[in-house]
Design a protein with these regions (language model features):
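Catalytic core of non-heme Fe(II) oxygenases with the double-stranded beta-helix
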Residues: 79-260
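Non-heme Fe(II)/2-oxoglutarate
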Residues: 1-74, 80-82, 126-186
């Protein structure tokens, strides 16, 4: 089964512990206009609730596992965009990849994750047939209007924008990395069929932040509604995206490898 939802396995006390940690400001915080995140490292970072996360994982994973990536995040929906179509496959070593594990922690408005039947057998990447520069960004000005910046590297005056210089510098650094490279040729996506046209109604309701051209040829496996207390799992090779609709949501993603 590609997707499995474990219902009511995370207690209110466990969620509070994880939320309190996420909301604490420390050196791990990465704050940008559209997302705030923290990425502690398993068995290396101190003073984070690893034991709580391990309790949750041990309840749902029955084989030996190694957490590779721990990602706490808060997404703001409007006017920004949810996470795009992507895959969290690490370096792409198929022999070790196990599960994406998603733990909803808090939400404002209907929140969903869309998982596709299609798989990618390469390293982590984003997908889009339209080639958009990673340096194109939307930022609110102080009047509350969206300002489209075609290249944030060329942005010199930020006095009219709701972004600090520190946030801008960090954004440029992140957008310069390999993680922001994207696959525009879908030929090597498992299950891709160029004759399939993506459903317009589903696009409008759940994936309006992604150009529909980027979804043609793909097939949805599951549209998963976020519910507090649940844990969502699926194979790391599966293409997936955050759904549109929420105002704000906070979650924890853990990617695991098969343990030795």
């Amino acid at each position: 089964m590609a997707v499995k939802v474990y219902e009511n396995v995370v207690s209110k006390d466990q969620r509070k512990i994880l939320l309190d940690y996420f909301k604490t400001t420390d050196d791990l915080v990465d704050s940008r206009p559209d997302v705030r995140s923290k990425t502690p490292v398993w068995n290396q970072t101190t003073n984070w609730p690893q034991d709580t996360v391990k309790q949750i994982l041990d309840d749902i994973i029955k084989l030996k596992y190694d957490p590779e990536w721990i990602f706490f995040y808060m997404l703001r929906q409007y006017p920004f965009r949810p996470f795009p179509l992507h895959v969290d496959s690490g370096d792409g070593d198929q022999s070790k990849l196990h599960k994406n594990i998603l733990i909803p922690l808090d939400l404002d408005g209907p929140a969903t994750t869309i998982v596709f039947k299609n798989k990618w057998h390469g390293p982590s990447t984003r997908f889009g047939t339209t080639n958009v520069s990673p340096f194109r960004y939307e930022i609110l000005n102080h009047g509350g209007a969206i300002q489209v910046i075609e290249d944030i590297r060329e942005l010199k005056d930020i006095s009219h924008l709701r972004i600090t210089q520190e946030e801008l510098d960090r954004l440029i650094e992140v957008r310069s990395g390999k993680v922001n490279q994207r696959v525009t040729d879908y030929t090597n996506i498992e299950g891709y069929d160029p004759n399939i046209k993506f459903d317009k109604q589903i696009h409008q309701q759940y994936l309006s932040h992604i150009p529909i051209e980027n979804l043609h040829g793909l097939t949805i496996d599951s549209i998963i509604e976020w519910k507090l207390g649940d844990v969502i799992t699926f194979d790391r090779q599966h293409l997936h995206s955050a759904g549109s609709g929420h105002s704000k949501k906070i979650g924890l993603t853990v990617t695991t490898n098969v343990g030795d």
